């Protein structure tokens, strides 16, 4: 699949997701004092809070040292809250998925994409199944039709890799949400929670971010006797950093470019850099632009 085709696929999915997703939930991060020059960073809560606090706490320390400004991580309660906090100015820099990043930029004129991981240009989701479901690995996408009548869990409704793109590929192969058991999917709230509900047998099938799946397997949080991958999606573009406009006015000329460079310069050669990149499941960050997430 060419880069143009991948962008077309994700753009089609994003358009569908924007039509299906509720506009905005209330913000979980408190708005900071506009007189206090603090760079507020955030992220969609796609994994367990303990891991996110460690990751973004370490990143805040690293960025503060490199940029010589106070940097604070402000967690939010859900995906919509991340978009809302970015729109209102409570967050200056946010790690979004494909769908939430588009939502954030549409609601915040002048916001722009700064960077993505080396794995985000060709990202994939996986469908996993509980062993008792009787489902075996699919050899082609048209076998997704076997999901009809099954109990299936997505992560967040606003997740690109945990709902939007898996649902897009299901639809391409004749499976509508109402075809699932109970008349629709369940929502676990995050990728690691999807693993948990499928492994426990609460759901027969789940769809999630492949990087989180691999990380949980490596950390031995997955019982291979109870749950396994049955299908991997084609690649698409996904996660990325989005920055608000006006940071140069608050922090000084050229600050936004310095911020981008600080992200791109993260290296496994330093202790903090190695920790950050490992927790992100990446080897490095690479430049990205708005056009990567549109037609």
Each model region followed by its residue ranges:
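A ligand-binding cleft/hinge motif common to bilobed small-molecule-binding domains
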Residues: 95-108, 171-172, 197-200, 204-225
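An extracytoplasmic/periplasmic, membrane-proximal ligand-sensing/linker region
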Residues: 36-42, 47-58, 236, 242-243, ...
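Ligand-binding cleft/hinge of the Venus flytrap
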Residues: 58-68, 156, 160-187, 215-222
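Short helix-initiation/N-cap motifs at beta->coil->alpha
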Residues: 73-84, 97-99, 177-196, 235
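Short beta-strand->loop
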Residues: 111-120, 180-184, 217-235
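Bacterial signal peptide processing site
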Residues: 24, 28-31
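Short, glycine-/small- and polar/acidic-enriched structural segments
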Residues: 33-140, 210
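A conserved helix-loop-strand patch within extracytoplasmic ligand-binding domains
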Residues: 117-175, 179
